[in-house]
């Protein structure tokens, strides 16, 4: 009986240790998920600076954040992502001028995108990847999505896509693909670089061809060159399959939007 009792206690102790271990894993997973969201919101705050200043050829580093109406410098405690806009009810604390909801939208969107990337690549399903690849995938996708957010909102307001997003993406994509070949489902650096190069050429070439055909058919420019460079950057980061999916999805969404506007 004593032996059976000891075995029972050992089994009970092991179950308790497993439950504690799972609780610790869940705690740290939620902790880092919260950090990813907050970090994304902070990156979104910086992207707002870039969205406002890059089209105006202003430095994104200096001067500090200021009100676009009265140029009053914004102190750090009034520059907290999302919360400051809500507390100030979308108005400058100094001149009461309106602050566009776009600032909060960019911060929220970037925070949610960063969280989604973390939840994707920190999940148990991603553990089959090489140990060094898994943590590196997260910042690479964060950088890629930050560039897309920047390019999207600048294009929405000014109908241009900054070269820092397009040309920068085409330059950085192959380098990061060589560093993290798992980005393209590869194991060796040269395989990742090759896949990135194929994706870049596919994205740039396909959209350039579509634009060239459209210009000849309609006798006017049918597509901006910024879109061509952006597709090249997408291919450099995600490969040729992502290029085909992006072209198909954007065409489908464009068709749906056109039908709704008729």
Whereabouts are the PLM-identified features?
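Acidic/polar hotspots within intrinsically disordered regions
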Residues: 8-10
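Short, strongly hydrophobic alpha-helical membrane anchors
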Residues: 12-29
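Membrane-embedded alpha-helical segments in integral membrane proteins
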Residues: 18-21, 109-126, 175-180
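Functional transmembrane core segments of multi-pass inner-membrane proteins
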Residues: 36, 128-133, 137-258
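N-terminal signal-anchor/start-transfer transmembrane helix
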Residues: 38-48
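Membrane-proximal soluble regions of multi-pass membrane proteins
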Residues: 47-102
């Amino acid at each position: 009986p004593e032996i059976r009792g000891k075995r029972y206690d050992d089994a009970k102790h092991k179950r308790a240790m497993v439950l504690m271990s799972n609780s610790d894993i869940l705690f740290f997973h939620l902790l880092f998920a919260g950090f990813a969201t907050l970090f994304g919101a902070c990156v979104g705050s910086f992207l707002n600076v870039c969205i406002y200043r890059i089209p105006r050829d202003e430095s994104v580093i200096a001067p500090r954040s200021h009100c676009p109406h009265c140029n009053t410098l914004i102190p750090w405690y009034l520059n907290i992502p999302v919360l400051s806009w809500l507390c100030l009810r979308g108005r400058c604390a100094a001149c009461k001028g309106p602050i566009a909801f776009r600032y909060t939208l960019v911060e929220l969107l970037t925070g949610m995108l960063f969280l989604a990337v973390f939840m994707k690549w920190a999940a148990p399903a991603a553990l089959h990847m090489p140990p060094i690849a898994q943590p590196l995938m997260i910042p690479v996708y964060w950088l890629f999505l930050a560039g897309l957010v920047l390019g999207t909102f600048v294009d929405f307001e000014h109908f241009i896509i900054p070269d820092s997003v397009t040309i920068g993406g085409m330059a950085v994509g192959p380098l990061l693909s060589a560093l993290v070949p798992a980005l393209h489902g590869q194991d060796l650096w040269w395989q990742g670089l090759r896949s990135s190069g194929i994706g870049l050429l596919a994205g740039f070439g396909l959209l350039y061809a579509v634009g060239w055909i459209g210009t000849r058919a309609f006798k006017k420019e049918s597509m901006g060159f910024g879109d061509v460079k952006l597709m090249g950057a997408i291919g450099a980061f995600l490969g040729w399959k992502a290029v085909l999916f992006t072209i198909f999805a954007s065409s489908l969404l464009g068709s749906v939007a056109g039908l709704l506007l008729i």
